[in-house]
């Protein structure tokens, strides 16, 4: 079977590598920015490629094609170009003036985006910035009484190891 994984983070790399290990004949990991913009760890990307994954960058999903039985048969993607770089150094993309590209596949795994619901924290007086809780290195949340935060809620998408380490710091 052929698999398309959509995303550029560690979960996307896990899905890509797991698909290969479970016997997929071809796995394409589709990401809308450049490979250097992926949030996955560099070694995860390199290991996925070493295992046979194809990393297709600067492509944004457009629509899924199904066969006459309703089964997935392709992912159509829109080529992207870099439009500019934001003040935080992140590249922004826009649609390229190119036709859609068809990527044949039997399965699509969507592994994009994760965020915390920060509204409730903000309403409780806990400072957030771009959806992440603002905490000190000790994991203490300034302006709160005995509130500590760590893991993805503070750093954004990262590894479980980092989240566990933050828990140990907060408990100390």
What is the predicted function of each stretch?
Residues 1, 85-157:
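FAD-site-proximal beta/loop scaffold in flavoenzymes
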Residues 1-24:
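Rossmann-like NAD(P)H-binding beta-loop-alpha module
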Residues 8, 31-34, 152:
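Cofactor-binding loop segments of dinucleotide-utilizing enzymes, especially the Rossmann-like FAD-
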Residues 15, 153-172:
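A conserved FAD-binding loop/helix module that cradles the flavin
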Residues 16-63:
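Rossmann-like dinucleotide-binding cores of NAD(P)H-dependent redox enzymes
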Residues 54-56, 76, 148:
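General small-molecule cofactor/ligand-binding pocket signal
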Residues 58-106:
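A structured beta-alpha segment of the ubiquitous adenosine-cofactor-binding alpha/beta core
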């Amino acid at each position: 079977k052929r698999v398309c994984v959509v995303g550029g983070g560690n979960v996307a790399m896990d899905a890509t590598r797991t698909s290969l290990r479970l016997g997929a004949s071809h796995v394409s990991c589709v990401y809308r920015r450049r490979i250097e913009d992926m949030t996955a760890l560099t070694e995860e990307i390199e290991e996925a490629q070493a295992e046979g994954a194809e990393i297709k960058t600067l492509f944004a999903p457009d629509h899924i094609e199904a066969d006459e039985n309703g089964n997935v048969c392709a992912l159509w993607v829109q080529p992207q170009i870099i439009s500019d770089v934001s003040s935080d150094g992140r590249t922004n993309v826009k649609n390229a003036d190119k036709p859609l590209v068809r990527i044949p596949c039997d399965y699509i795994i969507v592994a994009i985006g994760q965020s915390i619901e920060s509204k409730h924290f903000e309403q409780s007086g806990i400072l957030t910035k771009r959806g992440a809780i603002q905490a000190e290195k000790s994991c203490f949340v300034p302006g709160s009484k005995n509130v500590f935060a760590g893991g993805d809620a503070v750093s954004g998408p990262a590894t479980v190891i980092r989240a566990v380490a933050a828990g140990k710091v907060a408990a100390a």
